[in-house]
Amino acid sequence: MIRAGIVGGTGYTGVELLRLLLPHPEVELVAITSRAEAGQRVDEHFPNLRGHCNLSYTAPDPAILGTLDVVFFATPHGVAMDSAPKLLAEGVRIIDLGADFRLPDAEVFAQWYGMAHRAPEVLGEACYGLPEYYRTKISEARLIANPGCYPTAVILGLAPLLAEGLLQEDTLIADCKSGVSGAGRSAKVGLILPETADSVSAYGVGGHRHRPEIEAVLSDISGTPLELQFTPHLMPMIRGIHATLYGRLAQPMSDAALQDLFATRYASEPFVDVLPFGSHPATRSVRGANMCLIAVHQPRPGQVVVLSVIDNLVKGAAGQAIQNMNRLFSLAEDAGLMQIALLP
């Protein structure tokens, strides 16, 4: 059994990790930490876990964490970097669901996150945890940077075209919508029901932290530096990300050729489902599942629109982290992740 721990177990991502790890056939969950809730039972905070989790929160203890096989950090940026070097030295594998290791350049990280990177000595070995494109590297890694939720949806939607040089790099637009859970569990006036219900609003239009992450990974996949316009929106729903992705083709392609490109690229991927050409995937179809639904459109010759939807807490966070763990420990990639999406 894989001995696992979670640092930061009171947020939505942390409890989603709990929900998925507790029934995992190859995992023993040993520790879940929270300084604020230390000593309190986990199921007192999350009644959906009653009868499934007997653990209590503890303060982070390096002596305990250092004995584990893998530690998940479901923490804000700036936390994992302080613990990573010591845990790695003790042979612990790390999966960081925060942003500390997603950007390979420490200066770029400082620019977007407003703090100096405090573990530059291990930043260079972090592997970006998108299994559909970095599967082999993930299997050999010690430190996994779990992708952000928006980047997961955008990269999976655009990468097949960019990997083949089929899009004009200066025409890329990502218009994305997210549920409120993507903003975390902390109390914020702008996220309470009277502020979000019956309303849609854009944010981060001048520059969102996920943009450099998306650009870095797509540049790596395409083999050429590229930029895109990324605009996120907050939607009056709890879960889900819907990415509408635009680009102009570098050469003419038929609808059938576009569909075949995506269908072939993702044919063997257990968690990417390419729908029939011209389909309209909905976020409600992936709620609670580690799945990305993709549909391709060509509304006029040369103009491509890709629709990509995920559950931000599962394929956009906890589910993908477990997918990465499965790769790290040579398990079936879909182990513990075959939940069917909830409907309605």
Swiss-Prot record:
The active-site annotation reads: 149
User: Keyword Oxidoreductase on this protein?
Assistant: yes
Give the catalysed reaction(s), semicolon-separated.
N-acetyl-L-glutamate 5-semialdehyde + phosphate + NADP(+) = N-acetyl-L-glutamyl 5-phosphate + NADPH + H(+)
Q: What is its EC number?
A: 1.2.1.38
- Quote the pathway field: Amino-acid biosynthesis; L-arginine biosynthesis; N(2)-acetyl-L-ornithine from L-glutamate: step 3/4
Concerning Gene3D superfamilies, the annotation shows: Dihydrodipicolinate Reductase, domain 2, NAD(P)-binding Rossmann-like Domain
Similarity remark: Belongs to the NAGSA dehydrogenase family. Type 1 subfamily.
Q: What is this protein called?
A: N-acetyl-gamma-glutamyl-phosphate reductase
Q: Which gene encodes it?
A: argC
